[in-house]
Every structure is written in structure tokens, then in C-alpha cells.
């Protein structure tokens, strides 16, 4: 029997991973043990097992067909996990590139993953900009508030298309400054 597969997305700096991890910890205390999987890490595991990459940066240099195959295999691997326990997939709905927005979950991944729910973590663009500027542990491209807002809009559009293709519900969770516990509670309410 398949357990729940939930995809959690958000732009860099919105706090999606933090909100998800805190929700997983609380749910675990309640006896609901989700496995949290980073999609990029799952892809790297596949690439590494096949001797195609020894670090995550090398994956970007693989030819597109190989990348697609690795994406598909990672999706299949996560779907297999869902036979054992519920899974929360931490990934990006879209990836902003110099040539435009790249879908984080193209059709061949969605077919394998078949999520039950897509969650988009958001907040105001100016809050994200300030978080990025104050986070010295990460090196991120400098963006304007308008650019961040556009990226969040594209994430919503992509999430809805993922829902159309799979029948997954789409939930927007707001992670406002100083109110992370509210975002965690909102996420928990749909994961139970």
C-alpha cells in the first residue's frame, strides 16, 4: 500500500526546509514518522551509485538525457520508499536559470513520484530578501523583491500544473518573519 507522498517547495531563503523539518520532528513525537527526502540528494545517490558523479556539482555537467534518466530513477526510488512510510520530498517547484525557469518536477518525475499533495512555502519578497542578505552561510544570487515575487508566482503556477497532472492538492503555507511556529502548525494540519 502506498503511503502519502508530499512535495514541499519554496524559493531559496523562504524557510521551506526549516518548516518541514520542524513539522517532521513534531509529527514523529506523535508517532507519525514521515521520511524527509531532498530530491537533489536522491538524484545524487543514483548518479553516485552509477559512477556518474562524486559530488552534487558534477551532476549539472551531465548531458540532459542522463540527467532526465537520473531524475526519473530518483522519483521511482522515492515512490518505493512510500510503500514503507509516508514521505515528504524537499525540492524546488521551479529553478531560476539564466535561460528562464526550469520545472523542478518535470512530467517524467511526476509520473514516478505521483504526489498526493504539493505544498508551496511562501512569504513576502522583502522578507526573503532580508533573510538572504543576513544569511552569511550561503552564497546566493542577489535579486530584487520583484524578482523574488515573480519566482514565487512561477512556483504557484508550476505547483498547480503538478496538481493538474497528478490530482495532487496544492496548499500555500505562509512562513512570516517571527511566526515560523504558525507555518509549522499549518503544515502539520495537512500532513496528519
UniProtKB/Swiss-Prot annotation:
It is an enzyme of class 2 (transferase). It is found in: Cytoplasm. GO terms for molecular function: adenylate kinase activity; ATP binding. The keyword Cell division does not apply. Its main location: cytoplasm. GO terms for cellular component: cytoplasm. ATP binds at residues 10-18. InterPro entries: Adenylate_kinase_AdkA (IPR023477), P-loop_NTPase (IPR027417). Belongs to the archaeal adenylate kinase family. Monomer. This is Adenylate kinase. It comes from Methanococcus maripaludis (strain C7 / ATCC BAA-1331).
Amino acid at each position: 500500500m502506498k503511503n502519502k507522498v508530499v512535495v514541499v517547495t519554496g524559493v531559496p531563503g523562504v524557510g521551506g526546509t526549516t518548516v518541514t523539518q520542524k513539522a517532521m520532528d513534531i509529527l514523529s513525537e506523535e508517532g507519525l514518522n514521515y521520511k524527509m527526502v531532498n530530491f537533489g540528494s536522491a538524484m545524487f545517490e543514483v548518479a553516485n551509485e552509477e559512477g556518474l558523479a562524486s559530488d552534487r556539482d558534477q551532476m549539472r555537467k551531465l548531458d540532459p538525457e542522463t540527467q532526465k534518466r537520473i531524475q526519473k530513477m530518483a522519483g521511482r526510488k522515492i515512490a518505493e520508499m512510500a510503500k514503507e512510510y509516508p514521505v515528504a520530498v524537499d525540492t524546488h517547484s521551479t529553478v531560476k536559470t539564466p535561460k528562464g525557469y526550469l520545472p523542478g518536477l518535470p512530467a517524467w518525475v511526476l509520473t514516478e513520484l505521483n504526489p498526493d499533495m504539493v505544498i508551496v512555502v511562501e512569504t513576502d519578497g522583502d522578507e526573503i530578501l532580508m533573510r538572504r542578505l543576513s544569511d552569511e552561510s550561503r552564497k546566493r544570487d542577489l535579486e530584487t523583491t520583484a524578482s523574488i515575487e515573480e519566482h514565487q508566482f512561477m512556483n504557484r503556477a508550476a505547483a498547480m500544473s503538478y496538481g493538474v497532472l497528478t490530482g495532487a492538492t496544492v496548499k500555500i503555507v505562509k512562513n512570516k518573519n517571527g511566526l515560523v511556529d504558525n507555518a509549522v502548525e499549518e503544515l502539520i494540519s495537512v500532513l496528519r
